[in-house]
């Protein structure tokens, strides 16, 4: 187990350099980069963490500031451009033995100057340098007096991030694309977005925007409307009939098969096609329904289908072939794909509804529908849904909310949602719940269905329920619902739609092929084992291994999206698939599947808290967050009305909202 030798991280000093009884401390920083190579030290926006006393802290500080100045400083303000240059030069002079002790005081003065920078990249970069000078002053003096020379024992790896980037599953360079919008360069903004997001019109509309929960502007007044700014860049290209500028590399002779044309499959194909690899996507749905769960799971009033199709057409134009109406395991086997292609990426999505577990659900009653995902798919494809006039949906996630809202648009006279916890504890996005409320959906909270009621013709007539009281928190942190004795009651209805979750259908994977499946019905992939200083395995926010390589135990077969980790958001599927595409490329070119140092650093930074909700952000002006125009009133949910509800920004509104961004970049560097 590694020991923290010194740390100033989080403004708390831990100093074990003199030996003796060590302070027991741990961080979410792994002790190795890849399970083998030790991380000896780490410098960043919140200080220094030292695992190895042999690390040359002055030399590391000098290299850190050199990289900040030459690689990351934007040069758009004088304090940043000049201040970082002088500071880097002073530190270099110290390491080269050309400085005096007075130069250590100059470092303090330069740090004060950098507090006037237009963004926080240069400001935050002074923190580890000042900590180094303060707590390792004797080491700096040893360089100044000529006693010490650079040992060059360690190699340094750097990476930049921002609180919003760190929280984005696709790691889009959010400050950069917002900066471009601020300068009315919408086309350049979209280029930046597409570096990590090939479905911008989709994620500009349906993304749950976790980035906004970590926006430092929120510490001043309210977060920047990051999602709608992304939509603004995409809408600008569409409304101006501009051609996307992507230019794939010359086509290579190795081919990739992709199972599923959902967000993960499309994203993987996009990034491989950019590198020149021919990709063939096999999609079970018919032509016209590319996009997977976006096409048959997300309502058109949230995501217009013509804009989804535009994103898909752009990907197809890069040489990606999508074969529709083809089910793997039925029309073509996975073994055949393995033989015909050099690599296979499994991204079938999660289209199988979970059972409710109530009495009568397996009897085939009229009006008891198979599941929420199935109901939505039939509705969007224009098929009979089997829905009546009084609809009950069971669940509390976004799919359940989509079902109650779509039921109204399909002609339901009453649409009711039953959820076993409180409104506050619903996993659905708050704005989607509010939208359902506005459209006239009826909610029954803290209610658990126990039995489906039917008449003599086996037609559903209602659901027997019991009231629930919220007890102690469970493993998810939410209070556990417990039945209230004697509280049984009936909700009258003619249709019941269970929408309590969905799973991938992996029945197309033969048992004898060598691909392992978890007890959660997801594909097992390899990962890099990372532990912190306390020996604890580091995992992501969903409890999965932090640094996943996305290759299965079957050589040349990879998995991503819902199939690899369970139901994910669109943006999480895309981030996952982008990583898979890079790993697949290395597999095709080198015969090895691994994560690069840059990718490992990306995972490490994601695991460390870049955003501090308690930070006091000094900012003089307070400007209200811009909200996009929206169609209001119950008439927007009238029968057959799938017109888009949220209308986006006009260009000037987007520019004004972009000006609220504080450009909160951070630079981190590890000694290996």
From Swiss-Prot:
Keywords: 4Fe-4S, Cell membrane, Cytoplasm, FAD, Flavoprotein, Iron, Iron-sulfur, Membrane, Metal-binding, NADP, Oxidoreductase. It is found in: Cytoplasm; Cell membrane. Binds 1 [4Fe-4S] cluster. The keyword Ubl conjugation does not apply. GO terms for biological process: anaerobic respiration. One of its GO terms (molecular function) is oxidoreductase activity. Its main location: cytoplasm. FAD binds at residues 254-283, 552-562. GO terms for cellular component: cytoplasm; plasma membrane. InterPro entries: DPD_II, FAD/NAD-bd_sf, FAD/NAD-binding_dom, Helical_ferredxn, Nuop51_4Fe4S-bd, Nuop51_4Fe4S-bd_sf. The keyword Transit peptide does not apply. It is a peripheral membrane protein. SMART domains: NADH_4Fe-4S. [4Fe-4S] cluster binds at residues 203, 207, 211, 215. May catalyze the NADPH oxidation in the SfrAB NADPH-Fe(3+) oxidoreductase enzymatic complex. Probably involved in acetate metabolism and not in the reduction of Fe(3+) chelates. May serve as a major route for NADP regeneration. This is NADPH-Fe(3+) oxidoreductase subunit beta. The lineage of its organism: Bacteria, Pseudomonadati, Thermodesulfobacteriota, Desulfuromonadia, Geobacterales.
